[in-house]
Amino acid sequence: QRQMCIRDRGMRCHGLKGGIGSASRVVELDGKPYTMGALVLSNHALFDDLIVAGTPIHTLLSDSIPPHEDKGSIITVLATDIPLSERQLRRLCRRALVGLSRTGSACGNGSGEIVLAFTTANRMPHYSEKALLPMEMLHDDAINPLFRAVAECVEESVLSSLLHAETVTGNHGQTFRSLTELLKNRA
């Protein structure tokens, strides 16, 4: 059971209640499992653009979502234990937009897409008797599975933020509906 946190209280994603969502994938490299994870704070995109598993959601729901602009932003944090260079982490950040587009986000003019990535690999000692330290790094030819994992994680994180959100009414009387509630009402 996920609980809404104070930070995601007023988030609107695709015109519905958004907020915090997360997902992860295990990627095997040289016979060893590594984890790629994504965490999003979703506050972006239009309802009519929302796609789940290739289906435009607005075609399934008769509920009317008030018109709104594609303003706000989505903040994405990618975390992994795969040994990556700073350049490779930047490349993963760019692939996060693939996951957003799978949910129907057009990354509009009023929307900001912020993506940060880090790795916990290659921990450096605070003190060392050696001037040069060894560092592992993924070969670029092996990075494609990570691109796919990032796209899948970001897509699932956005959907997670929508499915785990609860309908809320804000200070100004504006209600942000929960996708889960809308889907239950359809059944």
Which residues are covered by each model-predicted region?
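Short, small-residue-biased leader/transition segments that mark boundaries at the very start
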Residues: 1-6
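A glycine-rich phosphate-binding loop feature that marks nucleotide/adenosyl-phosphate handling sites
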Residues: 7-11, 112-119, 174-182
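Conserved phosphate/anionic-ligand binding catalytic regions in large, soluble enzymes, centered on
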Residues: 10-26, 106-109, 151, 155
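Glycine-rich, flexible loop/turn motifs
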Residues: 12, 16, 46-48, 53, ...
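Internal helix-turn-beta structural module
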Residues: 127-187
